[in-house]
A protein has these predicted regions:
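Short, small-residue-biased leader/transition segments that mark boundaries at the very start
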Residues: 1-6
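Short helix-loop-beta connector
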Residues: 14-20
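Residues at the starts of beta-strands that form the adenosine-phosphate
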Residues: 20, 43-44, 100, 126
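Adenosine-nucleotide cofactor-binding segment
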Residues: 23-26, 38-90
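Hydrophobic/small residue at the entry helix of a nucleotide-binding pocket
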Residues: 29
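Glycine-rich phosphate-binding loop and adjacent beta-alpha segment
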Residues: 89-154, 195-210
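C-terminal hydrophobic helical "lid"/dimerization subdomain
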Residues: 143-213
């Protein structure tokens, strides 16, 4: 789904030749957005994150990395992927006049506050929501979700995406892995869960809270 989301938002935003683009949030989604944009003839592409350790990911992609305070302004498009109030507020500062922010974050039931009383209206800025459930409007009449999925799978054959796989655990360890991820004890971009082969008990017992249908 991550690669499908990135395809959708590239179709939605429609970056043009020479555009200045920032991707805020160098996690799995932001990293994949930068990956798909890195070979496009942009004028500038920056991957922006608070964590200096994410520079390693940017370097592996051949993409410029910046701390939010050092990111270059006057962007044509900003892809916001940090799922944070501060990240979205910074997006408003980095996007240029009449520019567009593509909001790719999921906030669930969290409420955020934005400074829309400053120059948001005077600069005619736009924040566009992203939702992977539908094909981007620019391609909706000529592509189906099946077409998009096929494209996403084909793009994942690029070995560059192997760099996003930062660890693996057996299926029986899933409850603990989820707790560690939620609690911040496990740092991961994309953590692989290894399912046992049919008829094999190599992965150990099925977790108690596992349900089959």
């Amino acid at each position: 789904m991550g690669s499908e989301m990135c395809i959708r938002d590239r179709w939605e935003a429609g970056p043009r030749l020479g555009d200045r683009v920032a991707v805020i949030g160098a996690g799995l989604v932001g990293g994949m957005v930068a990956t798909l944009l890195r070979t496009f003839p942009l004028g500038r592409l920056q991957l922006v994150d608070l964590d200096p350790a994410r520079k390693g990911l940017a370097d592996s992609l051949g993409v410029d990395f910046a701390h939010p305070d050092d990111a270059l302004p006057d962007c044509d498009i900003v892809f916001h992927c940090s799922a944070s109030e501060g990240g979205l507020e910074r997006s408003l500062k980095l996007v240029g006049d009449e520019g567009e922010i593509i909001e790719m974050s999921w906030y669930a039931d969290r409420k955020i506050t934005l400074p829309l009383g400053e120059d948001f209206h005077a600069r005619r800025l736009s924040i566009r929501a992203s939702q992977v459930g539908a094909v981007a409007r620019a391609r909706r009449h000529r592509r189906t979700t099946a077409d998009r999925l096929e494209l996403a799978v084909s793009l994942l054959k690029d070995p560059v995406f192997d760099g996003f796989l930062t660890g693996a655990s057996k299926f029986a360890e899933l409850p603990g892995v989820v707790q560690d991820l939620a609690g911040g004890r496990l740092e991961a971009l994309c953590h692989v869960i290894e399912y046992p082969a049919a008829g094999s008990d190599a992965a150990g017992p099925v977790p108690e809270n596992h349900h089959t249908t």
